[in-house]
């Protein structure tokens, strides 16, 4: 089966992605695009966030997320990519049926509160007095440099 980024992974990986997406009601192309973006196009289960957040792997699992899934980022990093896909599925399972678009699938990774929201939903704002750091950490997603990062802007980077 041909899927986005399929030539960069093994046939077994591709098939597992397709199987996961059937269970989740998601498009395999969308999941592959998100994992390509999050892993710096490596699809490496051990790739770590360069900014030092502690995130690791195919969808950049944060330490607290790994713990909630019953593991650690070190254990995730030591897994094969195919084994880590079990945790990718587990992570998305609670949102099964709600990940119909690339934008919503990516929001489930970046900012889960935005799943199901309109494309102009504001994720981060430069002038947010309560959480200004959120914008700064994601400023690269503000394509039009207006000080606001919308759901659509964030997902454009994944396309």
Label the predicted regions.
Residues 2-139:
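Catalytic glycan-binding domains that act on GlcNAc-containing polysaccharides
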Residues 148, 152-154:
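A recognition module on extended beta-rich or small alphabeta surfaces enriched in W/G with H and D/E
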Residues 142, 146:
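Acidic carboxylate motifs that coordinate Ca2+ or other divalent cations, activating on Asp/Glu
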Residues 1-5, 156-159:
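N-terminal secretory targeting signals
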């Amino acid at each position: 089966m041909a899927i986005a980024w399929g030539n960069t992974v093994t046939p077994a990986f591709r098939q597992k992605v397709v199987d996961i997406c059937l269970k989740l009601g998601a498009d395999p192309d969308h999941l592959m695009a998100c994992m390509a973006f999050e892993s710096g196009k490596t699809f490496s289960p051990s790739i770590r966030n360069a900014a030092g957040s502690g995130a690791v792997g195919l969808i950049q699992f944060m330490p607290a997320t790994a713990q909630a899934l019953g593991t650690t980022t070190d254990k995730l990093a030591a897994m094969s990519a195919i084994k880590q896909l079990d945790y990718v599925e587990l992570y998305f399972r609670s949102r099964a049926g709600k990940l119909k678009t690339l934008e919503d699938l990516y929001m489930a990774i970046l900012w889960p509160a935005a799943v199901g929201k309109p494309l102009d939903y504001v994720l981060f704002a430069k002038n947010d007095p309560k959480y200004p750091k959120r914008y700064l950490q994601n400023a690269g997603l503000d394509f039009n440099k207006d000080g606001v990062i919308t759901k659509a802007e964030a997902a454009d980077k994944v396309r």
